[in-house]
Amino acid sequence: MTHQRRPLGTFVHARSGDKGGDANLGLWVAHDGSTHRDARVEWLLSTVTPDFVKTLLPEAAGLDVEVFALPNLGGVNVVIHGLLGAGVAASTRFDPQAKGLGEWARSRHVDIPGELLS
């Protein structure tokens, strides 16, 4: 199986936000008519682990990351504990509400099996 290095957002969508000092990140494969949707969902569910998230988003390294599989929705929910410090009012981050975290994750390059890209 050959892999190609592509942005995660090639076929993965995202939404993100804050809950106190934690960041919440939803990643899913849309129903776009692709014959590869089921295989893409399977790849996403098996690929997105706490370690994967810490590599994908270096600012999450050293933090507690939880990943919840949502197979019926074709995605995962990721909680990054403590990413926002004491919360939006006290955060010094450029994106204190983690609203841009989803697009940042989608822009990051990952190894994707070639057969999922056609």
Positions of predicted regions on the chain:
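Long, contiguous binding/interaction regions
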Residues: 1-118
